[in-house]
């Protein structure tokens, strides 16, 4: 049996507030499904959560998701998914968009469930925040106990972060993973592709299908974007890279740089690229003059001006330090549970400060926290 495993979709995400970027995510979802169907040898699709970018997706996002699902079903390819943090419903009597499609189409959720197909045991555990770690670990252990009764291949699906893979905010430690029981643990949530072994268990984050920021765009150059195909008969997997249609282009510019060469680099694409110009030892006003010349050839242009002493890695180092300082500041001033709550609230508003969906998510998170602790 050959199984396609797909990471985060984030349908509906409008990067930089641009309609073109929102459409890129829908087109990318279509690319992935078309590739799966064209292979004519995929028996099942597993999706690892964060189908939509928020728990109340637009009609366009819902339609884009359904359109591709219907293509899979026309080819009789079963589809299973788990719930990620972006579509998790925290209010009572609300239906998540994931759940909606289990009623509308012939697809199934693997939230805290397991199935056996062709002698392959597949368990899924829906997302839980760090404040619910005990409940999360209990559910993982419950699925591990069920898996122990099975003699064939065993697969676990999660939408979490493990401490060895994330600087801060991980809900699980490496020791929480039942690697001695499962042959494969596929995880959503982190957008970079990560592959590693723990004993005989392969731990794999397929990564998101599209890039949500420039860090992910740089990562695509190193690791690619796409999905995973698991061959259960051979107990092996294959990484499928599908280049994204819209390019992110990063160009270092100094006094000697040929600007005509810069213009040539960003021209000729079917989709206008997103361009970042990093100027060194150039006056900021001159940098913006240069940027103005090429702006029409870009979907979005960002300009960074640095002095000659700054290294290329300074920006990423500052990001890491700021995350670490936030962690320390919160944990020094409040309890562990309160620190987790505060950081989750920060994450909600960090993405889009003016979004009404974020306000709803923040209210739901607050209600949930105070019901549990007060």
Regions found by a protein language model. Give the residues of each.
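Acidic/glycine-enriched edge-of-secondary-structure segments
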Residues: 18-20, 53-54, 121-129, 240-256
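A conserved active-site cap/scaffold subdomain adjacent to cofactor or substrate pockets
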Residues: 188, 195-259, 265
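His/Asp/Glu-rich metal-coordinating catalytic cores
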Residues: 44, 55-215, 223-224
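Conserved beta-strand elements of the Class I
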Residues: 4, 121-123, 228
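Glycine-rich phosphate-binding loop signature in dinucleotide/nucleotide-binding domains
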Residues: 36-41, 147-151, 269-270
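Accessory, non-catalytic peripheral segments of nucleic-acid enzymes
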Residues: 234-374
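N-terminal active-site segment of His-dependent metallophosphoesterases
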Residues: 1-68, 360-364, 368-374
């Amino acid at each position: 049996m050959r199984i396609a495993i797909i990471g985060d979709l984030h349908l509906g995400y409008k990067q930089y507030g641009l309609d073109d970027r929102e459409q890129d995510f829908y087109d990318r979802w279509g690319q992935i499904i078309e590739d799966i169907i064209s292979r004519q040898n995929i028996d099942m699709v597993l999706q690892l959560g964060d189908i939509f970018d928020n728990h109340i997706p637009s009609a366009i996002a819902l339609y884009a998701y359904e359109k591709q699902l219907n293509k899979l079903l026309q080819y009789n390819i079963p589809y299973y998914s788990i719930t990620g943090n972006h579509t998790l419903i925290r209010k009572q009597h609300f239906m998540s968009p994931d759940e909606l499609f289990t009623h509308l189409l012939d697809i199934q959720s693997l939230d805290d469930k397991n199935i056996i197909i062709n002698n392959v045991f597949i368990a899924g555990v829906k997302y839980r925040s760090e404040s619910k770690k005990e409940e999360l670990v209990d559910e993982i252990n419950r699925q591990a106990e069920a898996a122990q009764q099975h003699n064939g291949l065993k697969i676990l699906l999660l939408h979490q972060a493990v401490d060895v893979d994330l600087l801060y905010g991980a809900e699980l430690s490496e020791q929480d993973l039942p690697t001695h029981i499962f042959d494969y643990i596929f995880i959503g949530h982190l957008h970079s592709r990560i592959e590693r072994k723990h004993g005989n268990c392969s731990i794999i984050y397929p990564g998101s299908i599209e890039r949500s920021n420039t860090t992910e765009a740089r990562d695509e150059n190193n690791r690619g974007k796409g999905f995973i195909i698991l061959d259960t008969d051979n107990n092996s997997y294959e990484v499928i890279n599908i280049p994204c249609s819209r390019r992110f282009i990063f160009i270092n510019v100094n006094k000697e740089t040929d600007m005509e060469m810069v213009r040539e680099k960003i021209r000729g694409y079917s989709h206008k690229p997103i361009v970042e110009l990093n100027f060194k030892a150039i006056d900021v006003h001159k940098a913006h003059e240069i940027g103005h010349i090429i702006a029409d050839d870009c979907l979005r242009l960002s300009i960074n001006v640095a002095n000659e002493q700054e290294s290329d890695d300074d920006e990423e180092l500052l990001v890491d330090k700021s995350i670490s300082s936030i962690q320390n500041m919160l944990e020094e001033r409040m309890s562990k549970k309160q620190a987790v709550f505060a950081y989750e609230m920060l994450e909600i508003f960090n993405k889009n400060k003016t979004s009404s969906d974020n306000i709803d998510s923040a209210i739901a998170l607050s209600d949930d926290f105070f019901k549990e602790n007060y």
